[in-house]
Amino acid sequence: MQMKREPQRTAGLLLLAAVTLSAGDRRVSLLPKLQPGQTLIYLIRFQSDKTVKTESKVVTPIAPNAAQIDAHGLLLVEVLDVQPAGAKAMIHARGQFLTLDSGVWLKKPGDNKSGWDRQHVDPHGKTIEFTISPDGSVNEVKGLDFLFPEQQQAWQQWVARFALAWTLPANGMKFGEKWKLEQAEQIGAPISGLNWARESMYVRDEPCQASQLSIMGDLSASSGPPDTCAVLLTTATLKQKSSSKDATPEDFKLHELRTMGTAKGTNEIITYISLKSGLVVRATEEASQFMDVMVAKADGSNRVHYNVDAKSHSEILLVTETPLDRP
C-alpha cells in the first residue's frame, strides 16, 4: 500500500498563520459531531526504529528489545454511546482492525541485514473498547492486551490524534490562539513522573478531503464533496518530575525493584480537523524519545543499565471509500 504525500513544513505553517490572523476572532468548535451507531474507517501508517544498548552481568527479561516496525492498515471504529458531559461529551467506542500489513525486525547486536517478519492480521480479529473522557484522556480500555504489539501501537497513534479535540478549550479556538496542556505519559515506563507538556496552535483553514483506497492500495481524494479543515500545529516535550536518583514506578516497587535514570522526548503533530463534521481528516506525527535507566533489585544487586533511542513517524487518514465497501 503506497502513499505519496507532500511533506508539511512547520516554517510554512507559522508563516501562513500570520496571514490568517486577520480573518477575525471567531471561535470554532472542533469537537466531532458523533452519534451512537456511527462508523468510521481510518488508514493508519506507523514506522518506528528503536535502538537499545544494554550493560548487565545477569540475564534479565526487563530490558526492551531493539526493533524496527513498519505497519499500515485499516481501523474500523464504531461509536457505541455518546454521553453529554457539560460542553464536551464522553464517547464510548469500539475499534477493530480490518487489515494490518506489518513488518517487525527484532534487531540483535551485529545484525547487518533486516530480518523482517511480515504478517497480515486476520480481519476477523479481536476488538478493543475504550472511552474518551471530556478532558481528552482515554480510559476503560478493554482488549488492548490481546492485540499484537504493532496493532497496539497503531491504535495508540490513532486514538491520540482522534482525541486531540477534547483537550482544546471548551468554547472553541480562533486563528493564532495557543492552548497549553500537561498530560501524564500513559504508556508504562521504568521511570516515574513522566508528563507531556503540549502546546497547540490554530494555524489556518485549508481545503481538505477524506481519502479513498483502491483495490491496488492506491490512495486518492474521495469522490465526496470537498471540505475545509482547521489546521492545528502541536508540539510536545516529555518532562520528568521524578528524581534521576530514584525514579521507581509503583509497579516496580511491588516487584522489589528500584530504578534511576532520565527520559526526554519531543513530538511534532500536524492535525487537519473538518470544520463541518469535527472529524480528524488527516494527522501526521514525528516523534523522538531517549531514555537512560538503571534497574536493580531493591538491595542494589543485579543491576542492569540500558539506554533506548527511539524515533517514529505516523500518519492517519479518514477513509470514506475502500475495496471492502465493494462487492
Language-model features: where?
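Residue-level marker of intrinsically disordered, low-complexity segments enriched
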Residues: 1, 17, 314-317
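Bacterial N-terminal signal peptides that target proteins for export
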Residues: 2-12
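Signature of exported/secreted
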Residues: 24-327
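Hydrophobic h-region of N-terminal signal peptides that target proteins for export
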Residues: 14-23
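Short intrinsically disordered, low-complexity coil segments enriched in acidic
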Residues: 1-2, 229
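Generic secretory/membrane-interface signal
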Residues: 2-4, 19, 193, 262
